[in-house]
Amino acid sequence: MTYSGPAIDTHHHIWLRKDVGWLADPPVPRMFGDYFGIRRDYPVEEFIQDVKPQGVTKSVHVTAMWGPGKALEETRWLQSVADKNGFPHGIVSNVDLADPGVEAALKAMRQAAAEGVH
């Protein structure tokens, strides 16, 4: 029997290419190979359209690594997207746990609705 109930996508990304340095900058070799096909905007509306047929009703966005010093900005943007569109339901952001300002960074992320960090 095949499962046909609701599903949660526990790791996805959305972005505007202009905000993500490694997508907007000239391509360089990456450990994950050729990424030409994703060097474009992937807005939440398209994500929702892509996952609805699979029964996805909730999702968790994992950082798209906007670049140094931009993690809080990314998290705040994602929360504004969620407030407007209902997706994503959780946000996993990026914080350097070795940074001397880690406590302040974690507090700021929590206020911006981050559910976790990596």
Predicted regions and their residues:
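Active-site gating/metal-coordination segments in enzymes
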Residues: G69-H118
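An N-terminally biased module of ancient metal coordination in phosphate/nucleic-acid-related enzymes
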Residues: M1-Q79
